[in-house]
Regions:
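S-adenosyl-L-methionine-dependent methyltransferase catalytic module, highlighting the catalytic core
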Residues: 31, 37, 59-193
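Conserved SAM-binding loop
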Residues: 1-90
């Protein structure tokens, strides 16, 4: 909603789209429920498409389809915002209901400059800005310890439910041995930087 409001200073008409209809009531903004993998807009419907904090959540098998849709509806520009080289092993969660391991904050995809450019055939990047560390924030030993302990320090406060069953993610209880092991794993992560 914040970005939509800011964009009204640049564009007379703004369409705010999300999986659930955005709760925004402001002049010049039309709120729409939709899915980036199947946009219900005509070809070249928008001068500029802003797609931020979205593509990392799209299932990998639908990612190219989502990018093709952005290219299809953008008549001039597409502004894309994704985490740069995010370490998807960090902050995983485990669903207590079905046992599925979930990625951090529902992020299913990892991007670097080459991959992001390849996802948008026919578009030439005008500018690329990289933010974030762009390096691993964990290591294989820490990942193995977290997995053994059931990922107790994952991103359980995220909005997204389990990627397999949809259940709300709940932080597991851990005993003293698990706590000590996770303490060691966190320390290993800290000393690598």
């Amino acid at each position: 909603c914040y970005l939509s409001r800011k964009l009204t200073a640049l564009y007379p008409e703004v369409v705010a789209l999300d999986l659930t209809k955005p709760e925004i009531d402001a002049p010049g903004i039309t709120a729409v429920q939709g899915d980036v993998t199947g946009l219900r807009f005509a070809d070249n419907a928008f001068d500029t498409v802003f797609c931020t904090e979205v593509l990392e959540h799209v299932p990998p098998e639908k990612l190219q389809q989502a990018c093709n849709e952005i290219v299809r509806v953008a008549s001039r520009y597409a502004v894309i915002g994704v985490p740069y080289r995010q370490d998807l092993r960090d902050n995983r969660t485990r669903c207590l209901r079905c046992g599925a391991v979930n990625p951090t904050t529902g992020h299913l995809n990892r991007f670097d400059r080459q991959r992001l450019t390849a996802l948008f055939p026919g578009m030439t990047p005008r500018e690329i800005r990289l933010t974030g560390r762009g390096q691993a924030v964990t290591n294989p030993l820490s990942v193995a310890i977290y997995r053994l302990c059931g990922y107790p320090y994952g991103s359980y406060e995220q909005e997204e439910g389990c990627i397999r069953c949809g259940e709300k993610l709940v932080r597991p209880k851990i005993d003293r041995i698990q706590w000590a092991l996770c303490f060691v794993a966190r320390a290993l992560n800290q000393i690598q930087y």
